[in-house]
């Protein structure tokens, strides 16, 4: 910082002015990285020197120039020098009465500077000239580094707020914006509210003391809450990403360590393989010696083979002797076959007896099948009775649906009457509100003109006394306090008038509350009617559920009967097939018996096909009944949904009527 002091002194002397002792003292006591010139009256030469030094300064990250009473020229020179600075992060220009030229210089600063993150402009007059403030907003829209902006007490009107809203739509870095104690008004508040969905980074917006309705403030607070949630989520994601990146880096290090360990193990395995190859070479030598021994053993075996061939000749002679013995055995086998033929005849007689027994079993199975058929007919009669009961239930449901539709039509007619009456009352209240708003705007415009005239007079006095500013600074501060007291008195007078108008509006609110209570009574009556209809629908649903359970029980009984019959038929068929197989294996010559068995099988197939067709018919009838039952359930669900939808429509209409009351829009800001 010593170099900075020497450069400042040199530039001031080159311009023909002495350096300010207060500035030199602050530079001498300066902490590292922070230049605090607050409450120091900086001359134009000092501002020019600082504007030339700050672009090359690499240590100063914070610059405090609050209440320095900067002139337009001095502020322009200083801000022009900051355009090329790349290290400054915090800039405080509070209480310097910056106007048109200062606003334009700030706009250029925001366009060119890429390092300033916090900018404090409290107690200035940037919003007095719309064109200059539009230039400032253009610079804000193009800036990509600023995160915090303080614009309190800058006389920003609704037009300035609209320009600021356009800038916020293009800005992607600003996170905090303070607009307290300006003249934003209803139009400016709405413009700022409408720009918030386009801005994804702003999470704090202060609008207190701007004559903005409460509903707009609540909407802005809600949008800021969403932005804070997004910011929290983004920070959490960044933290998680950081943690995950650390984990990935740790895993990579572990993988590299594992790779090195793997390479070491591979080298060890290679050494072991070399050792094993040497051992295998020695083993091959041993195997070669063993192979030579085997060759000698094979030669010995060849000698044994010759001896075995001689023994084979002897065995052939023994085979001839065994052939003679075989001839005698064949004769014995012939006698045995004769005895087996006699036994076969006896088995054929037994098979005939078995066939007669099977025929008797088949007749018994036919009788049992007839009994099952009778049971199926009785179940069909019960099913027809259930179908008639279902038809009667359907008729009752149609009558109930017609009655519900009539009641719904009556409720809709009543709702239309209530809507017309509410619409008329809303139109009357809206016309009264418009008149009151016009009166209030005229009053505010007159007061604003008076204040502007007073400010212009004060500005003329300040310009005339600017040369003697160092001597009369205390007097200027006292006048500023008096102006603040007068402003507070004007605000208190406006607050009293607002309270009187609020009492008048509360009377109207009571009248509207009475109308709302009447509408709520009608809504409760409609809800009771809907509840009665729902209870009747639930009763019908219980009846349908009972019929469904009864139908399921009948289906279960029918399926059990079918399973028993199928099991019996399959058992009989299996027994017949087993008997048939044994008869075919034992009595190949008895063709007549085979034909009878085939006839029996054909009869069984015919019976099975008839039974299968009957089952298919029953299944189709059951499917049609299930489809009818499903349609009936869908009709009941649709009726329930219609009734619930109508009730929700009525409730939404009442809520919309209550929320559309003009009292909420005219309530004073908190």
Curated annotation (Swiss-Prot):
Residue ranges of LRR repeats: 58-80, 87-107, 115-136, 145-166, 173-194, 201-212
Name assigned to this protein: Leucine-rich repeat-containing protein 45
Principal place of residence: cytoplasm
The keyword Flavoprotein belongs to this UniProt entry's keyword annotation: no
Subcellular location as annotated: Cytoplasm, Cytoskeleton, Microtubule organizing center, Centrosome
Modification Phosphoserine occurs at: 661
Post-translational modification as stated in the protein's UniProt record: Phosphorylated by NEK2 during misosis, phosphorylation reduces centrosomal localization which subsequently leads to centrosome separation.
A GO cellular-component term linked to this record: plasma membrane
Purpose of the protein: Component of the proteinaceous fiber-like linker between two centrioles, required for centrosome cohesion.
Keyword annotations from UniProtKB, A to Z: Coiled coil, Cytoplasm, Cytoskeleton, Leucine-rich repeat, Phosphoprotein, Repeat
Subunit field text: Homomer. Interacts with CROCC/rootletin and CEP250. Interacts with CEP44. Interacts with CCDC102B (via N-terminus).
Coiled coil: 252-645
Superkingdom of the source species: Eukaryota
InterPro entries linked: Centro_Cilium_Assembly, Leu-rich_rpt, LRR_dom_sf
């Amino acid at each position: 910082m010593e170099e900075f002091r020497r450069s400042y002194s040199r530039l001031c002397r080159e311009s023909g002015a002495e350096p300010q002792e207060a500035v030199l003292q602050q530079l001498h006591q300066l902490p590292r990285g922070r230049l605090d010139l607050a409450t120091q009256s900086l001359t134009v030469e000092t501002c020019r020197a600082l504007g030339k030094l700050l672009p090359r300064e690499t240590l100063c990250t914070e610059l405090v120039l609050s209440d320095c009473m900067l002139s337009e020229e001095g502020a322009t020179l200083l801000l022009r020098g900051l355009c090329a600075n790349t290290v400054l992060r915090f800039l405080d220009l509070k209480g310097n009465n910056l106007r048109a030229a200062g606003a334009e210089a700030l706009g250029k600063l925001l366009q060119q500077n890429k390092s300033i993150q916090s900018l404090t402009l409290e107690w200035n007059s940037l919003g007095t000239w719309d064109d200059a403030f539009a230039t400032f907003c253009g610079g804000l829209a193009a800036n990509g580094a600023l995160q915090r902006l303080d614009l309190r007490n800058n006389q920003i009107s609704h037009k300035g707020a609209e320009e600021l809203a356009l800038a916020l739509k293009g800005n992607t870095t600003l996170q905090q914006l303070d607009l307290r104690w300006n003249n934003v008004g209803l139009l400016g508040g709405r413009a700022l509210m409408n720009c918030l969905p386009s801005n994804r980074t702003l999470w704090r917006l202060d609008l207190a003391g701007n004559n903005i309705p409460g509903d707009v403030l609540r909407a802005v607070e809600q949008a800021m809450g969403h932005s804070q949630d997004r910011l929290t989520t983004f920070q959490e994601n960044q933290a998680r990403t950081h943690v995950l990146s650390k984990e990935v880096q740790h895993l990579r290090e572990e993988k590299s360590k594992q790779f090195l360990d793997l390479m070491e193990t591979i080298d060890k395995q290679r050494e072991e393989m070399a050792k094993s190859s040497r051992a295998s070479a020695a083993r091959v030598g041993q195997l070669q010696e063993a192979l030579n021994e085997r060759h000698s053993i094979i030669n010995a075996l060849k000698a044994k083979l010759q001896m075995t061939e001689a023994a084979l000749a002897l065995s052939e002679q023994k085979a001839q002797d065994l052939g003679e013995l075989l001839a005698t055995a064949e004769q014995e086998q012939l006698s045995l076959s004769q005895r087996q033929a006699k036994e076969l005849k006896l088995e054929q007689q037994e098979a005939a007896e078995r066939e007669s027994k099977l025929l008797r079993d088949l007749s018994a199975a036919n009788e049992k099948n007839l009994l099952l058929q009778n049971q199926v007919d009785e179940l069909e009669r019960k099913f027809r009775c259930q179908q008639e009961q279902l038809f009667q239930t359907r008729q009752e449901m149609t009558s109930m649906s017609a009655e519900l539709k009539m009641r719904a039509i009556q409720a809709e007619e009543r709702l239309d009457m209530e809507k017309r009456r509410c619409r008329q009352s809303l139109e009357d209240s809206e016309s009264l509100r418009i008149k009151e708003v016009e009166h209030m705007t005229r009053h505010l415009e007159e007061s604003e003109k008076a204040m502007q005239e007073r400010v212009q007079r004060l500005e003329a006095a300040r310009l005339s006394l600017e040369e003697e500013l160092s001597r009369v600074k205390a007097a200027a501060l006292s006048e500023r306090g008096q102006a603040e007291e007068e402003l507070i008195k004007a605000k208190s007078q406006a607050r009293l008038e607002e309270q009187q108008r609020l009492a008048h509006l509360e009377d109207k609110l009571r009248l509207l509350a009475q109308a709302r209570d009447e509408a709520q009574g009608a809504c409760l009556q409609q809800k009771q009617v809907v509840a009665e209809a729902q209870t009747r629908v639930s009763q019908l649903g219980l009846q349908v559920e009972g019929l469904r359970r009864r139908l399921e029980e009948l289906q279960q009984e029918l399926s059990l009967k079918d399973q028993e019959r199928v099991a019996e038929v399959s058992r009989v068929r299996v027994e017949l097939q087993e008997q048939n197989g044994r008869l075919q294996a034992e009595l190949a010559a008895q063709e007549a018996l085979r034909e009878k068995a085939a006839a029996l099988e054909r009869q069984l197939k015919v019976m099975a096909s008839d039974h299968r067709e009957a089952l298919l018919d029953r299944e189709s009838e059951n499917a049609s009944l299930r489809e009818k039952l499903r349609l009936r359930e869908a009709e009941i669900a649709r009726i329930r949904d219609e009734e619930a939808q109508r009730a929700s429509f009525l409730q939404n209409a009442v809520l919309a009527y209550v929320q559309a009351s003009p009292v909420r829009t005219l309530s004073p800001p908190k």
